[in-house]
Regions:
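Electropositive, beta-rich accessory/interaction domains or terminal extensions
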Residues: 1-107, 112-113
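Short alpha-helical interface elements
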Residues: 66, 90-91, 126, 133-135, ...
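Short alpha-helix capping/helix-loop boundary micro-motifs
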Residues: 82-85, 137-149
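Loop/turn positions that initiate beta-strands
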Residues: 94, 105, 145-153
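A generic structural signal for residues embedded in beta-strands
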Residues: 99, 110, 150, 155-156
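Active-site scaffold segments
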Residues: 107-112, 128-143
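Short, surface-exposed beta-strand-loop junctions and turns on beta-sheet-rich folds
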Residues: 116-117
Length: 156
C-alpha cells in the first residue's frame, strides 16, 4: 500500500466494558476519562490501560480501528483508534497496516470486522446499528510497540 495521509481524530482507552447487559439499563460509567491525546501500544498485547490489554482471548483483536463515519461523538462507538480520511473497512483480513503519527510506525494485523451492537441505537440516533453493519471497523493485533497521537498520521 502506498503511504497516505489521514487524521487520527480520536483515541480511546477504557478499563471497563461500558456496553454490557441490556441497553435499556444504560451504559456503565467509565472510572476515568477514556479519550486520550496519545496511547501506548504493546505488540501482541494491545493498548496500555484498555480492557482488552493482555487478555488471551482478545490478543488477535485487542485494538479496533474505525473510520470516522458516524456523525456525533466518536467516543460513543467505543473504538480505540478513530481515523478520518482512510477507509478502515476496506482492509482485508490478514493485511498489515502501519500507522505513524510522528513517533515511528506501529503495525497492526487485521483479523476480523468489529460488528456493531444494538447499543449503537441507544447512544446514537436510531438506525445507526443497521447503518454500521459492514462499517463497524476492524479488530486488529498490534505487531509493534509504539505510541500513537491524535492528529496527522501516515498510513502504509
Amino acid at each position: 500500500m502506498a503511504a497516505r495521509r489521514a487524521l487520527i481524530v480520536a483515541l480511546h482507552v477504557s478499563s471497563v466494558h461500558a456496553y454490557e447487559g441490556r441497553p435499556s439499563s444504560g451504559p456503565r460509567p467509565d472510572p476515568s476519562p477514556v479519550s486520550r491525546d496519545h496511547v501506548e501500544v504493546r505488540a501482541g498485547l494491545g493498548l496500555v490501560g484498555d480492557r482488552y490489554f493482555n487478555h488471551p482471548a482478545h490478543r488477535s483483536a485487542a485494538v479496533t480501528l474505525f473510520s470516522a463515519s458516524v456523525p456525533g461523538d466518536p467516543l460513543l462507538a467505543r473504538r480505540n483508534i478513530v481515523l478520518s480520511g482512510f477507509d478502515v473497512d476496506a482492509l482485508p483480513r490478514g493485511s498489515v497496516v502501519a500507522l505513524d503519527s510522528g513517533d515511528g510506525p506501529v503495525r497492526f494485523e487485521v483479523h476480523r470486522p468489529a460488528n456493531p451492537c444494538a447499543w449503537m441505537d441507544v447512544v446514537y440516533p436510531r438506525g445507526t446499528f443497521a447503518a454500521l453493519r459492514g462499517r463497524g471497523g476492524k479488530r486488529c493485533e498490534p505487531l509493534d510497540d509504539g505510541v500513537l497521537r491524535v492528529g496527522p498520521v501516515e498510513i502504509y
